[in-house]
Amino acid sequence: MSNCFFDVIANGQPLGRIVFKLFDDVVPKTAANFRALCTGEKGYGYAGSTFHRVIPQFMLQGGDFTRGNGTGGKSIYGEKFPDENFALKHNKPGLLSMANAGPNTNGSQFFITTVVTPWLDGKHVVFGEVTEGMDVVKKVESLGSNSGATRARIVIDKCGTV
């Protein structure tokens, strides 16, 4: 199992670190994409990108490092890659799952659940979970709104593997 981290800031102020365990054994291709985007080893990735959509009692979405508004991003396999499988369910808060625009449109955008979200099962690939820093997830969640607009610029300041 790989572990990755995000050091998160809001309007330039540190919020703390989120650590993720990736489910390499179940979704190796999806996990490898996220890990490489955390390390920046391909020359691009999550460092400096924002959580552009945050909905309290639902999720935090980020990973659009090309446009910053939810319309961009790219994977290490090209712009998009197929859904690997739907073996893991959205059955608890703190899960890491791929955001998409329909079947087989995974790129770099991801979301972190803050509640159980079973309606996403079979549509979004779960590939990891928060192991440390759920308090940081909650801080980010508190800066969101029902529309998803954020009340601060929430940035992944640093990221990588641990």
UniProtKB/Swiss-Prot annotation:
Q: Which Pfam families match?
A: Pro_isomerase (PF00160)
Task: Quote a single Gene Ontology cellular component term.
Answer: cytoplasm
Q: Which InterPro entries match?
A: Cyclophilin-like_dom_sf, Cyclophilin-type_PPIase, Cyclophilin-type_PPIase_CS, Cyclophilin-type_PPIase_dom
GO BP terms in the entry = protein folding
Q: How is its activity regulated?
A: Binds cyclosporin A (CsA). CsA mediates some of its effects via an inhibitory action on PPIase.
Signal peptide interval:
none
Does the record carry Iron as a key word? no
Catalysed reaction, written as an equation: [protein]-peptidylproline (omega=180) = [protein]-peptidylproline (omega=0)
Sorted alphabetically, the keyword list is: Cytoplasm, Isomerase, Rotamase
UniProt-listed SUPFAM superfamilies = Cyclophilin-like
| This enzyme's EC code(s) | 5.2.1.8
Is Ribosomal protein given among the entry's keywords?
A: no
> PPIase cyclophilin-type domain: which residues?
5-161
Where is it located? Answer: Cytoplasm
Instruction: Give the main location.
Output: cytoplasm
Instruction: Please provide, alphabetically and separated by semicolons, the GO molecular function terms listed in this UniProt record.
Output: cyclosporin A binding; peptidyl-prolyl cis-trans isomerase activity
EC top class, as a word: isomerase
Concerning its family, UniProt says:
Belongs to the cyclophilin-type PPIase family. PPIase A subfamily.
Q: What is this protein called?
A: Peptidyl-prolyl cis-trans isomerase
Species source reads Schizosaccharomyces pombe (strain 972 / ATCC 24843)
Q: What gene is it encoded by? A: ppi1
